[in-house]
Amino acid sequence: MFDKLQSIKERHLDLERMLADPAAAGDQTRFRRLNKEYSDLKEIVQAYDRYASARQQLEESRHMQKAEEDPEMKAMAREEMLELEERIPGLEQELRILLLPKDEADSRNVIMEIRAGTGGEEAALFAADLMRMYQRYAERQGWRCEVLDYNESSGPGGFREVTLTISGHDVYGTLKYESGVHRVQRVPETETQGRIHTSAASVAVLPEAEEVDVEIRRDDLRFDTYRSGGKGGQNVNKVETAVRITHEPTGLVAACQEERSQLQNKERAMKMLMAKLYDIKLQEQQQERADMRRTMVASGDRSAKIRTYNYPQSRVTDHRIGFTSHGLPHFMQGEIGELIDALKMHDQTERLQEAARA
């Protein structure tokens, strides 16, 4: 492991020198590739430096503890030595996690689909709540979040389905754990007897695809246009600017109505369709690994009930890892980072154990 870490550090220094060369900016494609590799290695190098520094301090403390004659200085050296011996295994574990193979899609932007499930109008309201939760989390992360398409429910404020695009650093790697069925328990505003109702909404997180990821034959596509309910200004409900694309071999559908022109909506819908087809490819790869890896955390099983939001008890529970928080109002305001970090750590621990067994 440490030979590999030393090689990574040397590569990081090489990249730093290459990026500092003014000529590097002449080829923007190469510059972006080098800059991404540099950024990807930076966290590993920083963790390795912390580990190496702690090891060096430990050796110095051991030497001082043996060589020092002053009892007080000897005791100080021993105290520092014990502290470092306790801290170093954690730093080593951090390095092992950082060296785990990365999911090639982790750095990509995502398309997120939220659909109301069982529960009628209450499920549609919950879908809208989830949308706002993710929008606020994206804002906290410094990501860009846009609504691509939506289908409002019959009642005010709800969505039968809504599609978002979220762009930024490591978006898929962070949000991929959100795929699945989210269940809510609360008293609807229309409930006169105070009874708690259970509703559900499903979330699908798809990594944005690039043209090289999927091959689409134009003959396999059907394009339909319709009147938009989006932000088309004077065109709204007058011109058919909204676009729906159907991939006939699979039956997959992607639609966009939020842009001002038909061409822009067509481009956005095409991106959504590519993401859906790429997701099928990823799901097939994950299924191939399913026999070796039983954890549901990153399986992306869309039918799995992953989380319950209990409003009367102000509690949110993630059933995959047994995580419980009693700060539901803050959670719904987008403060979901603690849970996402716990899911990441659980996933990484599972992968470390899998690597140790291999």
From Swiss-Prot:
Modified residues (N5-methylglutamine): Q234
Localization per record: Cytoplasm
Record key words, sorted: Cytoplasm, Methylation, Protein biosynthesis
Post-translational modification: Methylated by PrmC. Methylation increases the termination efficiency of RF1.
Keyword Protein biosynthesis: yes
One example GO MF annotation: translation release factor activity, codon specific
Pfam hit, one: PCRF
Listed GO CC annotations: cytoplasm
The UniProt record lists the keyword Oxidoreductase: no
Family matches, as PANTHER family: LD18447P
Function comment: Peptide chain release factor 1 directs the termination of translation in response to the peptide chain termination codons UAG and UAA.
Family, per entry: Belongs to the prokaryotic/mitochondrial release factor family.
Protein name: Peptide chain release factor 1
